[in-house]
């Protein structure tokens, strides 16, 4: 147990699927897992452990933003002996080729944040996903015909729709990186995995397209953001079967 997680160590599986939204974690447990139990609800950050096609899996919310993801993923790795966390979430799409609900598989994530400096006194702003986990996800995506778009992603500290000038933020990103999407949690997850010798990956479903200073050109509804992501959820769970 930790101040943020009331589960006993044995209540948490060594593979965790991690949406940001606690209600999405509940949705996954109710619609995809067998014999699941709620093992933590501190701060209404739900964690459920059950089985998917016989594989023991925990689904736990991270909350929004790097500080929240940083706490929950660190504790799972450090105190619950979790080996692998696959983040599943939503993102804004920056590539003109993306469509709503396309699934991005982040190969590496860039952030301007000082998360790594705070956590580990390292001036680090670019961190990779686990190649092993990404390779499994990519193979699984082909096997079950749920395609992914691979690329670099950005991790911001402000919701991009609320930025006064999103173009200035994008212009500060090194020109060779060219992020295809943006979210708010993956850098903390990937860095914690790197720091603690664990594995992490991130799947994102595109819910806003071509965000600019006038807003997105297409956007999913609040209901779609909660429940309209079944392909991504299925891909994460099917990939977990191969871990």
Residue ranges of model-derived segments:
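Generic non-transmembrane alpha-helical segments
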Residues: 136-144, 192, 235-243
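Flexible, glycine/charged-enriched surface loops at secondary-structure junctions
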Residues: 35-41, 145-152, 243
């Amino acid at each position: 147990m930790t101040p943020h997680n009331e589960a006993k160590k044995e209540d948490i599986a060594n593979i965790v699927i991690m949406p940001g939204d606690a209600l999405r974690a509940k949705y996954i447990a109710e619609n995809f897992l067998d014999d699941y139990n709620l093992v933590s609800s501190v701060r209404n950050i739900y964690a459920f452990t059950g089985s998917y096609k016989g594989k023991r899996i925990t689904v736990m919310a991270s909350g929004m933003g790097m500080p929240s993801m940083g706490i929950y993923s660190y504790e799972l790795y450090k105190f619950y002996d979790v080996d692998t966390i696959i983040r599943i979430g939503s993102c804004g799409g920056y590539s003109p080729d993306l469509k709503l609900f396309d699934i991005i598989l982040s190969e590496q994530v860039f952030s301007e944040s000082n998360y790594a400096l705070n956590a580990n006194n390292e001036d680090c702003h670019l961190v990779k996903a686990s190649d092993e986990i990404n390779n499994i996800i990519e193979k699984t995506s082909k096997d079950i015909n749920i395609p992914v778009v691979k690329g670099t992603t950005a991790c911001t500290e402000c919701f991009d729709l609320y930025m006064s000038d999103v173009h200035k933020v994008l212009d500060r990103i090194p020109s060779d990186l060219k992020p295809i999407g943006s979210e708010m949690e993956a850098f903390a997850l990937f860095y914690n995995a790197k720091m603690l010798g664990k594995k992490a990956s991130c799947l994102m479903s595109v819910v806003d397209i071509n965000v600019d200073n006038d807003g997105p050109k297409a956007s999913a509804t609040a209901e779609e953001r909660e429940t309209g992501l079944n392909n991504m959820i299925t891909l994460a769970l099917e990939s977990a079967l191969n871990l």
